[in-house]
Design a protein with these regions (language model features):
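Mid-to-C-terminal catalytic/tRNA-binding core of tRNA(Ile)-lysidine synthase
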Residues: 188-280
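Solvent-exposed amphipathic alpha-helical surface segments
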Residues: 18, 55, 150, 213-217, ...
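Hydrophobic/aromatic-lined pockets within catalytic cores
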Residues: 78-79, 148, 210-214
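Contiguous mid-protein beta-loop-alpha structural module that forms a pocket-lining wall or clamp
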Residues: 96, 101-200, 204-208
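Core alpha/beta nucleotide-donor-binding catalytic domains of modification enzymes
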Residues: 1-145
Length: 281
C-alpha cells in the first residue's frame, strides 16, 4: 500500500523519540489478492520468528485485541472449523520455540483508542481496514455495530466463550493423549484400534491428528476435510489415497493410515555420454 511508507515514517520517528529500536522489513511478494489471510499471517509470523532468533528473544507480544478475537470467532463459525478453531485467538500460544503473548486481548478497539487519546499518544489509522473487500472487514463494519447495540460489552462474552472452549479442549486433549498411545503405531493410525472408540472420540482424535500436522495452517482445513478423513479411515476400502491441502497425501494400506507430505522431484539434467541410434526402417 502507498500509505505504508507514511506509516513506517510515523512509527520510526515516534520510536526514535523513545529510544526504542525498530526492525522493519519489506516483503516484495506481499501483494493484495496474492495470498489468503492465513497465508499472509504465516509469512508475517515466520518473519517475526526470524527477528526473535536474531535478537535471542523467546517472547513476542502482539497487539491483538478483543475485537480481533470476536471477528476471528465469527469468521470461523461462518466458514466452519474445529473446536480449537472456534476458540479463536489465545492469550498465550507458541510458535515453534517462541512464546506469543497478547496482553490487549481483554480490551476492545474503542477502549484502546480512548486510552491513546487520554494519554496523548499519537497513532495512525490503517486505511486497508476501511474496505469491505475482505470478510473480516465486513464483519467489523456491519456485524460488530449490531452486537454493540445489543450489548456494549459483547466482546467480553466472546472472550468468555473462547476461554470456555479452551478449557474444554484441554480436557479433551488429556483424553486424546491416552487414545494416541493406543492407536498410533510408529506414527501410523491402527485402524482396528481406532474403530474401537466412540464416534465422538474418533472425531476428536482426527481433529488433533490433523492439527498436529498442519499447526498454524490448520485454517486451510474445513469441516469437509475432517469428514473426508474420518470416512477414509472408517470406509470399507482396505487401500485408499486422497490429496489434502498443501500437498499432504492420505495413505491407507494394510490396516494402517497416515498423512505424509508429497514428494516432489526436482528438475535434473543427465548427459548421455554413450548412445546408439537405431534405424526403424
Amino acid at each position: 500500500r502507498k500509505e505504508c511508507e507514511e506509516e513506517y515514517a510515523f512509527v520510526k520517528n515516534y520510536l526514535q523519540k523513545l529510544n526504542i529500536p525498530l526492525v522493519y522489513y519489506e516483503i516484495d511478494s506481499y501483494e493484495k489478492g496474492k495470498f489468503t489471510e492465513s497465508e499472509a499471517r504465516q509469512i508475517r509470523y515466520q518473519k517475526f520468528l526470524e527477528v526473535c532468533h536474531e535478537y535471542h528473544a523467546n517472547i513476542l507480544l502482539t497487539a491483538h485485541h478483543a475485537d480481533d478475537l470476536t471477528e476471528t470467532i465469527l469468521m470461523r463459525l461462518l466458514r466452519g472449523s474445529s473446536l480449537k478453531g472456534y476458540a479463536g485467538i489465545k492469550q498465550v500460544s507458541f510458535y515453534e520455540d517462541v512464546t506469543l503473548l497478547r496482553p490487549l486481548l481483554t480490551r476492545n478497539k474503542k477502549e484502546i483508542y480512548g486510552y491513546l487519546k487520554k494519554q496523548n499518544i499519537p497513532f495512525v489509522h490503517d486505511k486497508s481496514n476501511d474496505s469491505n473487500d475482505y470478510i473480516r472487514n465486513r464483519i467489523r463494519h456491519e456485524i460488530l455495530p449490531l452486537l454493540e447495540r445489543e450489548n456494549p460489552y459483547y466482546y467480553q462474552k466472546f472472550l468468555s466463550f473462547s476461554e470456555l472452549l479452551q478449557e474444554k479442549t484441554n480436557l479433551i486433549d488429556e483424553e486424546i493423549s491416552k487414545v494416541k498411545k493406543d492407536v498410533l503405531v510408529n506414527n501410523k493410525i491402527d485402524i482396528l484400534r481406532f474403530k474401537n472408540y466412540s464416534k465422538a472420540m474418533q472425531n476428536a482424535f482426527c481433529e488433533d491428528y490433523l492439527y498436529q500436522i498442519y499447526q498454524e495452517n490448520i485454517t486451510k482445513l474445513t469441516k469437509k476435510h475432517l469428514n473426508i478423513f474420518m470416512n477414509l479411515l472408517l470406509g470399507k476400502k482396505e487401500n485408499a489415497y486422497y490429496e489434502f491441502p498443501m500437498d499432504y497425501l492420505f495413505i491407507k494400506n494394510e490396516g494402517y493410515a497416515f498423512l505424509k507430505k508429497k514428494e516432489t522431484i526436482k528438475p535434473f539434467c543427465y548427459s548421455l555420454e554413450d548412445y546408439l541410434v537405431l534405424d526403424d526402417k
